[in-house]
């Protein structure tokens, strides 16, 4: 290892490597694929610092390499373009809130604690669930935590998920449960794009710890007859988990109404911009059953009174958490997405119940308009005839790679490629009629 001006203590590094029985630093990264390892020396810290104007110029040069789009991307699959009220950014920028760290000291954090309490209350109302924590990192993490809750409650070692799950969420889940040696079983998808409910009868429920359903599913299809799933789970001592798009609840049944034990999701749709994958916020909620609540990881803010009878907010049930009792903690999560959760609370407060319903209706109308235009122009057909929300899977008559490349050349980002002729399109309230028409017309010219 060569000396570096920022890392001068080479002898100490060698001592540490010797202590853990490693010859060099590279051995610590053997699990990283070889083609991802940088083979040249990274020239950082050798030259004298640049003036501010030079730094700004260099960063602008890098930014110029970004693709300039005429319209918001028609790309969803877990991250969605939505209109964000400007007041959200203003509130988040206030110094009292501008931190993502947990407010451990209630005597100096009443503002942020109340903001998180309002987030929990608003989210509980939206989901029609009883208890909501003050956020996780993202949807995948919340799902994994919910599955581990189920395992701790009943001790069974199989987890049932649908084939129509977001593949990134599945990767996170499989990584988390591998340490507990839990087995993941998939429910097949039928010809209508929905889960095959008959498959449940073939399962040995004595082995099933939890069952997870995504609504709408990864392909945008709205699942139906979910009461059958919750009834089956309740009769067989299986923890039922529903992953849900928050904005879809303006039109479809909530997890609470359907009788699910746990609800998970992502707050990205609620006032958070697209930003190279994050930060977003993971939603985790349960019904009021202390068997569930005691196993719920993450921070929970409660309202109480101080010794003088004044209303106050503080973290509650902290013995569930690893900083309180590490060896018996429900999770190793040590913080949350407080700032993002606050943005979610502001967004929900601004829209209210009617606003959420109107927005969901507008998204529904625009996405169905886009599909109709694509079918009217005989570009292909939708893969499933079932109803959908916000996203739909389209099967083209010709090669989608060529279509997508041409769209990018024209400053339009199409849907997510699922196969040689298949793509998943997302349409929300930010996609105007003109944007949709231009998308369809461009595809018609090159299809």
From Swiss-Prot:
It catalyses: N(6)-[(R)-lipoyl]-L-lysyl-[glycine-cleavage complex H protein] + glycine + H(+) = N(6)-[(R)-S(8)-aminomethyldihydrolipoyl]-L-lysyl-[glycine-cleavage complex H protein] + CO2. It holds the Pfam family GDC-P. It is an enzyme of class 1 (oxidoreductase). GO terms for molecular function: glycine dehydrogenase (decarboxylating) activity. Keywords: Oxidoreductase. Its EC number is 1.4.4.2. Signal peptide: none annotated. GO terms for biological process: glycine decarboxylation via glycine cleavage system; nucleoside metabolic process. It comes from the Archaea. SUPFAM superfamilies: PLP-dependent transferases (SSF53383). The glycine cleavage system catalyzes the degradation of glycine. The P protein binds the alpha-amino group of glycine through its pyridoxal phosphate cofactor; CO(2) is released and the remaining methylamine moiety is then transferred to the lipoamide cofactor of the H protein. Belongs to the GcvP family. N-terminal subunit subfamily. The glycine cleavage system is composed of four proteins: P, T, L and H. In this organism, the P 'protein' is a heterodimer of two subunits. This is Probable glycine dehydrogenase (decarboxylating) subunit 1. It comes from Metallosphaera sedula (strain ATCC 51363 / DSM 5348 / JCM 9185 / NBRC 15509 / TH2). The gene is gcvPA.
């Amino acid at each position: 290892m060569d000396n570096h001006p920022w890392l001068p203590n080479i002898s100490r590094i060698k001592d540490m490597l010797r202590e853990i029985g490693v010859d060099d630093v590279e051995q610590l990264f053997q699990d990283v694929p070889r083609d991802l390892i940088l083979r040249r020396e990274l020239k950082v810290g050798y030259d004298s610092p640049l003036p501010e104007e030079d730094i700004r110029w260099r960063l602008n040069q890098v930014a110029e390499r970004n693709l300039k789009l005429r319209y918001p991307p028609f790309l969803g699959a877990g991250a969605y373009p939505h209109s964000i009220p400007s007041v959200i950014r203003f509130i988040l920028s206030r110094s009292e809130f501008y931190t993502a760290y947990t407010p451990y000291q209630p005597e100096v954090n009443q503002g942020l604690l109340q903001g998180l309490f309002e987030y929990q209350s608003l989210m509980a109302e939206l989901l029609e669930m009883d208890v909501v924590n003050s956020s996780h990192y993202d949807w995948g993490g919340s799902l994994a935590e919910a599955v581990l809750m189920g395992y701790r409650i009943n001790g069974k070692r199989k987890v049932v998920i649908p084939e129509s799950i977001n593949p990134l969420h599945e990767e996170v889940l499989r990584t988390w449960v591998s340490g507990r040696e839990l087995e993941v079983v998939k429910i097949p998808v039928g010809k209508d794009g929905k889960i095959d409910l008959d498959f449940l009868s073939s399962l040995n429920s004595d082995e099933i710890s939890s069952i997870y359903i995504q609504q709408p599913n990864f392909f945008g299809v709205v699942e139906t007859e979910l009461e059958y799933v919750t009834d089956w789970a309740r009769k067989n001592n299986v923890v039922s988990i529903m992953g849900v798009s928050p904005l879809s609840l303006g039109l479809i049944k909530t997890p609470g109404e359907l009788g699910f034990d746990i609800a998970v999701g992502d707050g990205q749709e609620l006032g958070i911009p697209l930003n190279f994958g994050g930060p977003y916020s993971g939603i985790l909620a349960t019904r009021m059953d202390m068997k569930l609540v005691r196993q719920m990881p993450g921070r929970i803010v409660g309202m109480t009174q101080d010794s003088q009878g004044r209303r106050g907010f503080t973290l509650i049930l902290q013995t569930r958490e690893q900083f309180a009792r590490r060896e018996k903690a429900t999770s190793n999560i040590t913080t949350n997405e407080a700032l993002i959760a606050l943005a979610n609370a502001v967004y929900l407060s601004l829209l209210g119940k009617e606003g959420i319903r109107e927005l969901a209706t507008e998204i529904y109308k625009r996405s169905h308009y886009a599909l109709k235009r694509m079918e009217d122009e005989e570009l292909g057909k939708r893969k499933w005839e079932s109803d959908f929300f916000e996203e739909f899977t389209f099967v083209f008559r010709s090669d989608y790679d060529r279509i997508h490349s041409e769209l990018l050349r024209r400053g339009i980002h199409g849907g997510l490629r699922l196969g040689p002729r298949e793509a998943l399109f997302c349409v929300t309230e930010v996609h105007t009629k003109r944007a949709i028409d231009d998308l369809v017309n461009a595809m018609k010219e090159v299809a």
